């Protein structure tokens, strides 16, 4: 009997991950045993295979289907369905296709100073990078800017991603260019990402975005995306001057049918420090104020998920929550865990081609002229084979514990696993420094305070606290 892979199944091999597959539209690859991979590789419509229990299991799972001999003669498998990648495994890319923006936000973490960013990928450069991404086994994209929809070839870039069998998982936008025509074109491409729209509080958005009418445009875009069936996530920066608007903003966004809102402490990146001295919430102040908002939010019936930066994610429909400072639960810690699992799985590329562990760190790296590599000059695959970039993102928490005595000796380290590298770098100037937000969270009892406020809601991040 002849068999062929389901069109949504793509086999992949990388260094250290030689046997895996993607399901089209899902970000991460799934590991296989050698014998499973080899059998699936033969499901190409050209090999007459014995109907083994393993093959029956693949048929039942919908991974392969049987063909009659006449069908097998005309089968031509999609090249997307099998690829060997001569590099380390990275399933995703966070791609700033342009640094240009119709706003000039006061807090932009992409900038090294207060000047607008003007670099971007040409269409030719974008096509070349996508060819390389396909070759390297990249599967999912977060498209960002600047304002990505300002790029004159925005839709051509989307089409090029889908033409190669990859997909856009998230789109970061200020919403200004979202209209019915744009959403219809995205649907025609098959592009249905989580659309993340910036909205920084009722009555405060125009100021932070440095653009009159930005608030009205953001709310219009949010409504239109929801009406068109897109999942929408609001990105909300909180600081001292808009703190009083947070709870009313959450209630408004929930009433509009948003899937999720993320509240982010506006952080001490170079541009924000220049533009808003005194507006940044101190870490303890931030935790205290956020817990007050949480306590009020859960008193009422809400549907919208609220993700509070470095504190917690509230899941109202499940009456559950996850504490963000708990990276590893009881017994989950391993020295081999990357210092940032997000960075290890997602290549971050700025509009000038520079690569970073994450784009939230890009302004700092640019200000220090700390260049880890550049895809326009070096290509993508060499950076995923060896060099400064790969070394940084593959650094493990075991190495962090060895290099950072404070973390290595901390009783909470195996739960926070060193915290966020972007925060540590911003606050200490050390890539392997202490994430002071995690120290504060654990040592000042914020785990216990959070659990107490949430009452009988299900805690998905239970740990045993020991202060000895």
For each of these PLM feature ranges, what is it?
Residues 5-31, 53-94:
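N-terminal [4Fe-4S]-dependent radical SAM core
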Residues 123-144, 151-282, 286:
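Radical SAM/AdoMet-radical enzyme domain recognition
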Residues 339-344:
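Short, small/polar residue-rich loop motifs at catalytic or cofactor-binding pockets
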Residues 100-110, 357-360, 405-423:
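Local cysteine-cluster metal-coordination motifs and their immediate loop/turn environment
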Residues 30-48:
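Short amphipathic alpha-helical recognition elements used for nucleic-acid or partner binding
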Residues 86-124, 136:
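Canonical Radical SAM [4Fe-4S] cluster-binding loop centered on the CxxxCxxC motif
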Residues 129-145, 434-468:
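Short Fe-S-cluster ligation motifs
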Residues 284-327, 360-408, 458:
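C-terminal accessory region of radical SAM enzymes
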